[in-house]
Every structure is written in C-alpha cells, then in structure tokens.
Regions:
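Conserved class I S-adenosyl-L-methionine
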Residues: 2-52
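Class I SAM-dependent methyltransferase SAM/SAH-binding core
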Residues: 58, 64-106
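A short acidic, Gly/Pro-enriched loop at the edge of an enzyme's catalytic core
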Residues: 105-117
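A short glycine-rich, Lys/Arg-flanked "PGG" loop and its adjoining helix->strand segment in the class I
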Residues: 132-144
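Conserved beta-strand signature within the Rossmann-like core of class I S-adenosyl-L-methionine
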Residues: 145-152
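Acceptor-substrate binding/catalytic loop of class I
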Residues: 158-174
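Conserved S-adenosyl-L-methionine
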Residues: 184-195
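Core SAM-dependent methyltransferase catalytic element
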Residues: 195-211
Length: 211
C-alpha cells in the first residue's frame, strides 16, 4: 500500500467504501467481536481519567456497541459515534445509548464535552493526511485534561485500500508524532494481545491526556 495524497473526491470515496464494508458485514461483525476480551483497554482508559466517576465518554467508532454496553453498565454517561448506518442501528439496539451516525471525515462534535474519548480499532481508518484535523477535533471535544484512548493495528507506516477498507498501519514513533502534534501528552502505551512475543502483538494501544 502506498502513502499518496488523496484529493477530496478520493477521500470521500475511500470513506464510502469503508463504511459500505461495515454496512455489509454488520451482523457478522457484531457476532464475531461481541465476546472479545478488551478489559485491558477499558482499565487503561478509565484509570487515566481524573476525578470521580461517572464520566462523560465518547465511544468513537463504536461499531455494534459492545463497548457502549460496558461503559453504560458501569454507570458512565456514554455516547457512541459511527459512520455505518447498520452498525449504528445495532449499537442503539444493544446499548440503549445515544449513537451519532457521522463520518469521521465530517464530524460535528461539541466542544469541551467529554472526560474521555475511547477509540478502539477505529482511527486507523482515517487517511494520514486527514489525521491531524481529526485528532484536533477530538482534542477540542475533550474537557481540560481529558483522556484519549486509541488501539490500532500497527505496521511500517503503510496505508491504502486493504480489501474493502481504507487502513493505516503506523509504527509507534509515527503515531506518537501525530498525536503529540495535536496537543496530547502520552500517559503510556502497550502492545496486544498481552503475554505474547512482540512479533505476535499486532495491536498498539496508547493512552493520552489533553495538554
């Protein structure tokens, strides 16, 4: 996959292709991921948020709502956002939470609204040329010293259309540069699944605080 700049129409089309993929596989995606153990990610995210719960949380790229269900069950005020109409429908049904249907490239987020933004396996679909703008929008929607959690598949800074999804695979240093440039301070990072050799840990999880 090549890292080449996309013009506006190409960006829109890559986004549409990715969303159409999730619309097609929405039910299978729910049944295939609903029992995944991401408790390590929940703990890393919630432990970094300052103050006393319950917290105001945005699940960015919430998919079919597994994580919405968890945060809601813990008493937090959680809102979801996803670009796929089919996934949004399932997420609302599963969680009972408010879920916004918004394309990542055209979000409309309130300012200074959330204690934390949980972006589990979602931001890697944002083309790198748009990532600074998207991260700034996330920064703006967080309250002072709010927390951003991200988990993305890692790689050697390749990006492009992978099958029917646009994907970016950053290494740690490159991902750090993007998020730090948006104004965030790194809290910590880790690789998943835990307990395996690094070459068998394809996921990079990072926790950030609004600077």
């Amino acid at each position: 996959m090549k890292n080449t700049a996309l013009h506006k129409a190409q960006l829109q089309r890559m986004s549409e292709i990715t969303i159409e993929h999730y619309d097609r596989v929405a039910d299978d995606y729910w049944y295939g991921t609903r029992n995944h153990d991401v408790s390590q990610n929940y703990e890393a995210f919630l432990e970094a948020i300052e103050g006393k719960p319950p917290f105001d949380i945005l699940d960015l790229g919430c998919g079919p709502g597994r994580d919405l269900q968890y945060f809601n069950s813990m008493g937090h005020a959680v809102m979801g956002l996803d670009g796929s109409e089919a996934l949004v429908f399932i997420a609302r049904l599963n969680s009972g939470c408010e879920v916004l249907q918004q394309n990542f490239l055209a979000m409309d987020l309130p300012e200074h609204r959330f204690d934390g933004v949980f972006a589990n396996a979602s931001l890697f679909h944002v083309p790198s040329q748009e990532l600074p703008r998207i991260l700034l929008e996330v920064y703006t929607t967080l309250k002072s010293r709010g927390v951003l959690f991200c988990s993305n598949p890692r790689g050697n800074n390749e990006e492009g259309l992978e099958g029917s999804r646009y994907s970016c695979f950053f290494d740690l240093d490159t991902w750090r540069d993007y998020v730090i440039d948006a104004g965030f301070i790194e809290v910590h990072h880790y690789f998943r699944p835990t307990g395996l050799p690094r070459d068998r840990q394809p996921w990079l999880a990072t926790v950030w605080r609004k600077g």
